[in-house]
Amino acid sequence: MKLSKIKKVLSGTVSALMIASAAPVVASAADQQTRGNVGGYDYEMWNQNGQGQASMNPGAGSFTCSWSNIENFLARMGKNYDSQKKNYKAFGNIVLTYDVEYTPRGNSYMCVYGWTRNPLMEYYIVEGWGDWRPPGNDGEVKGTVSANGNTYDIRKTMRYNQPSLDGTATFPQYWSVRQTSGSANNQTNYMKGTIDVTKHFDAWSAAGLDMSGTLYEVSLNIEGYRSNGSANVKSVSVTQGGSSDNGGQQQNNDWNQQNNNQQQNNDWNNWGQQNNDWNQWNNQGQQNNDWNNWGQQNNDWNQWNNQGQQQNNDWNNWGQQNNDWNQWNNQGQQQNNDWNNWGQQNNDWNQWNNQGQQQNNDWNNWGQQNNDWNQWNNQNNNQQNAWNGWDNNNNWNQNNQQQNNWDWNNQNNWNNNQQQNNDWNQWNNQNNWNNNQQQNNDWNQWNNQGQQNNDWNQWNNQNNWNQNNNQQNAWNGWDNNNNWNQWDQNNQWNNQQQNNTWDWNNQNNWNNNQQNNDWNQWNNQGQQQNNDWNQWNNQNNNQNNGWDWNNQNNWNQNNNQQNAWNGWDNNNNWNQWGGQNNDWNNQQQNNDWNQWNNQGQQQNNDWNNQNNWNQGQQNNNNSAGSSDSLKGAFSKYFKIGTSVSPHELNSGADFLKKHYNSITPENELKPESILDQGACQQKGNNVNTQISLSRAAQTLKFCEQNGIALRGHTFVWYSQTPDWFFRENFSQNGAYVSKDIMNQRLESMIKNTFAALKSQYPNLDVYSYDVCNELFLNNGGGMRGADNSNWVKIYGDDSFVINAFKYARQYAPAGCKLYLNDYNEYIPAKTNDIYNMAMKLKQLGYIDGIGMQSHLATNYPDANTYETALKKFLSTGLEVQITELDITCTNSAEQADLYEKIFKLAMQNSAQIPAVTIWGTQDTVSWRSSQNPLLFSAGYQPKPAYDRVMALAK
């Protein structure tokens, strides 16, 4: 049964999709077909023989579609590359990003789809399906590929004498199919992801599949065969250029392969970790920004940690665990205490790292054998020349590398020179170091022996020294007088950070600046408590958030892949590694220390108080805001808002409080988040909708406590509203209810939500609410149909919209403005539909404003098109809010231009525009993250668009 089905599916797919191309193939006269281009994206809908019902409504990088009782159906949108006649490799890294609500009911799948020519080939990257997984058991198994957090099975199937781009032909099909579907049958699946298309192409080539042809297209495809279903493709983007995303896989670039070929399967992850590997430790949801990525890419962790041993950064930095900063710098109140003294004072490596707790089962063995840390640092007993004595050639690389490659384990082993028989190679090559030398004492334990925030050295001496000690003198230059203080006297961080006084050691004594506030205290201040280094780096489980070196022009790209740290250190400049113009400020701009390390949780730290680094980030939450904040700059025009998810409220707290006086919960007030099915069934009597604000609680409390106004989003929406809400007894299997019952449910949902907000958050300013969201099709066809909206299915007309606004007007708190919100609102036909509904509601006295979501791109719409829609909405006499602004781009200058124009329009019409909301805080958390659509990049780094927008308000 399945085999016959797949043959029909494949046949239908081929004939369908070749019609979508610019090939000399003509659809059957009986076929239903629409094709076109919107905003630079090609689209097509095809319904074989015109059977059943099928529709597609395209927008700029988005579309909706539905099908029922069809033979074969597809709807697709993407980019066509045929005119360029190039192999896929010529385009760099091709990435497709999608945000889709996909509802398959039977045989259907959602995939990335396309062709190559010369030779002819058709391909699929399948993300989800309904009741059958393509391509069944047909074809040859070609292995697997792991990409973007998923594992895909690779198959090759053949089509013989079938329709194709080039007429009837015989050609292969290549498949990557997720081992676990991203969707389930007979339900709405909220699918959001990024597909590294190039990585699949590379994997196919590596598996022996011919990828020599010219790329024809890359599209997102929704397909159905003898089934029903629908999809709301909220966004699809195809970008190319740049380097391929390793997806956290590291491919051939892991510790073993790059720098330690003798370790076999004992890579860095296994080496110090057991069940808490290095990836886990540093990759708390950071996607591509784990330490492996950062410390790998032809520059392994050894290089990273011993870069200081290569000129400025050594194991001293890396291994400070249980000895606080004060002690470290002031062993016995020695103000000029240098690195030599640091490791001495009877505080050898055993004592220093293990507090007498590890005995003979760990680093004690590794770094000791009667060769304590002092000896390691002072091979020649140069107590006053520390690193100079150790680094006679100003370069650890010269001592421990061949061909400028940090391969400790091949020649001149560090331990062979310095450690008797217990060399570093042994430590790295014990085939699971933990098992042989650590037993159950893994790296996390070693790093967290009483620490909480694993140490300053680890960051500081890996980040800053090159900036201050340039020109091939590394540790010698830094440590000429054996004094940490000297490092900061003449080459202060201040020089790189304007007025942010980095000079910890003004009095040549850390204690003078920090008093008795040691590093542990500094990191914990009652704020961090049990937050260890893992948490410190990943406070918010950010995706590429925080210290996103890889997104800050990661050093491998700037600093020769073949030249390891020598390549980086030849110029002895951290700036070169972390920034383009040897200026940390170029990359960090306003990204303060507190933001990076503490994400708003170190407010009262001495560091903040002593060094002013966090000048712009400390509780800047007055209503007007400072002039260097968005809300401050635009305070005389309108509120500045953003959308947030709860996970960002801790890590980004200071950033949010500084820049925004309005917050929209990204998902937590949508119907699926607030409707309580269990309570509805127990207490609802089939009509009284029960509400829970538990998922929104953290966001609501944050707004209330910090005086930030709330934009509610949303009550009535065809999407993210559970099907059971429309059925008898609030049951998934019940019949759909009548209009009368639905009216009662709608009224009680709105009434109970406002009541809960008032009772649970009495001081919260709910200043506006999206009552209805995304009602209309993109083509001027009016409201969505019953096949795409349960509201329309039950009501059959727009009466539910009128009722929703009526109930909201009745129950909303005083001062809360009621909005009709929609996207692609600048498409002229849709502009008219929104305008007409708004005027209808205005005549009834139920509406206050129109929400323009404003999901834009630099290539569509232009500012004039947008202004036309804005003026149409303003002509209603209602308020207009820009509610979800983002602008995708491939060119930051073009993005800055359009942001400037949109803000200028808003400022010119601020009498009717009370708020502008940016849909997200930083690119890495955006739903369109692959196209960098926001004002801030990873780590809350201001972009050119931010600068242009801020300049408008001056």
Swiss-Prot record:
Family of this protein: In the N-terminal section; belongs to the glycosyl hydrolase 11 (cellulase G) family.
Signal sequence range: 1-27
Enzyme Commission number: 3.2.1.8
The species this protein was found in: Ruminococcus flavefaciens
Record InterPro entries: ConA-like_dom_sf, GH10_AS, GH10_dom, GH11/12, GH11_AS_1, GH11_AS_2, GH11_dom, Glyco_hydro_11
Domain (GH11) ranges: 29-236
GO molecular function: endo-1,4-beta-xylanase activity
Region of interest (Disordered), residue spans: 233-628
Protein name (record): Bifunctional endo-1,4-beta-xylanase XylA
Compositionally skewed regions (Polar residues) per UniProt: 233-243
Superkingdom classification of source: Bacteria
Taxonomic lineage from the root: Bacteria, Bacillati, Bacillota, Clostridia, Eubacteriales
Gene3D superfamilies named in the record: 2.60.120.180, Glycosidases
Pfam families assigned: Glyco_hydro_10, Glyco_hydro_11
